[in-house]
């Protein structure tokens, strides 16, 4: 918008991103030393969930020698960081074959394909089939289970189910990484769910780290919707 005297000139407004046949929409980014293929046009969000960058690095720091499963892995962000941190074995689980295929290409790009097993499965079913003590670290980073206040209780039940499943099969002393990216699942409610899941699973949660989104996704106190990501690392005792 540009004011000229008493008249207002308005340029045509474009919706979405400007698409040019000569503009590539696939690129490779570097995240803490990991090379990652990103499909800006067809991928979820901007092709990669940049808001979890610093949180994925936290996993890398505790992964050495551990058996790790990355649930709802998308293109393998957490799984790749676990492998980069010299985990003993890593499993990347997602229902989307397309996401898993891209995750495998990311693993190849970093010469980590021999360290990660890619499994196409429904995470709820996969967790049901796990044996106790099979993994040292379980990452739960699901898509938003609720995108409105009307479905919060349904989302609460879904979060509780997967967290309880994970708590029951993790080895004693193992780590649970639990996330929610829904702003409608408020922090107090999410923590209440975690306490209930732990009680029903018969475990105690020892808090290791609590964070939110990466700094390049700023939280504005005048806009409550900007505070949406909840990230917890617990040790199971």
PLM ranges: what are they?
Residues 136-165:
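Mobile active-site "lid"/loop adjacent to the S-adenosyl-L-methionine
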Residues 98-139:
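S-adenosyl-L-methionine
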Residues 89-94:
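Conserved SAM-binding motif I beta-strand of class I
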Residues 1-10:
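Single conserved hydrophobic/aromatic residue that forms the stacking wall/gate
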Residues 134, 161, 175-237:
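C-terminal catalytic and target-recognition region of SAM-dependent MTase-like enzymes
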Residues 13-86:
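Glycine-rich adenosyl-nucleotide cofactor-binding module
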Residues 112, 170-172:
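Helix-to-beta-strand junctions that scaffold the AdoMet/dcAdoMet cofactor pocket
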Residues 86, 108-114, 199-204:
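Short helix-capping segments at alpha-helix termini
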